[in-house]
Amino acid sequence: MTDHHTRETPRNPYAGAYPGNLFMVVAPSGAGKSTLVNALLAGDDAIRLSISYTTRPPRPKELDGEHYHFTTVDDFMKRHDAGEFLESAEVHGNYYGTSRVWIEDQMKSGHDVLLEIDWQGAQQVKKQFHNAVEIFILPPSLEALEERLKKRGQDEPNVITRRLLAAGSEMAHAAEAEYVVINENFDRALSELQCLVAATRSRFASQYARHTQLFVQLGIHLPHA
């Protein structure tokens, strides 16, 4: 679906910077994105996970308000038309959307925010937040991706086939990401993810937004656009 409420911000990378950072983790189904994200969040209480709205039916053990805000197509479209979503997309026949107000409130308060998102959504977010960091998680091979999809036992064989067919076109968009992590060894992939978060927090724009008074006292000012 196309989000008609996307509002593009100025291209100055320092304009309107919030104290909090915005991370987007993108991956095809079965690449291990959610497992890596959960491990990252467990060891870093400064990151808030954005909970998306979706029209997808809940999977076993998924809770409304914890894993997703599960809603109807009618309610989703009303929210979309009202401009409530920072980004929205249709994936495998279901709609997903991210709350704009919640994201901005968290970042203004100094919290980092992480979005588990698809490549379409990442493109929409980057039009509005040019400092957003996209991290693409790749599997070590297509064979490994298929095996992981089968092992998790969440989808019927026809759904797995559809996800594998979609994975090729999805992974082609890894070229649009700032960083790529290949999830062959979980511990190594998690370490790389943690390093990318730490490096992002040390960027000039991020440090200036968090410590503006210190920078001004030291005579350090924002570069011109």
Curated annotation (Swiss-Prot):
Highest taxon of the lineage: Bacteria
GO cellular component, one term: cytosol
Pfam families membership: Guanylate_kin
Keyword ATP-binding included in the entry's annotation: yes
Organism the protein comes from: Paraburkholderia xenovorans (strain LB400)
Family annotation (PROSITE patterns): GUANYLATE_KINASE_1 (PS00856), GUANYLATE_KINASE_2 (PS50052)
Domain annotation Guanylate kinase-like: ranges: 20-198
Enzyme Commission number(s) from the entry: 2.7.4.8
Descriptive protein name: Guanylate kinase
InterPro entries named in the record: GK/Ca_channel_bsu, Guanylate_kin-like_dom, Guanylate_kinase, Guanylate_kinase_CS, P-loop_NTPase
Binding site for ATP: 27-34
Localisation: Cytoplasm
Signal sequence interval, chain numbering: none
Keywords recorded for this protein, A-Z: ATP-binding, Cytoplasm, Kinase, Nucleotide-binding, Transferase
GO molecular function, one term: guanylate kinase activity
Function: Essential for recycling GMP and indirectly, cGMP.
Catalytic activity: GMP + ATP = GDP + ADP
Sequence similarity: Belongs to the guanylate kinase family.
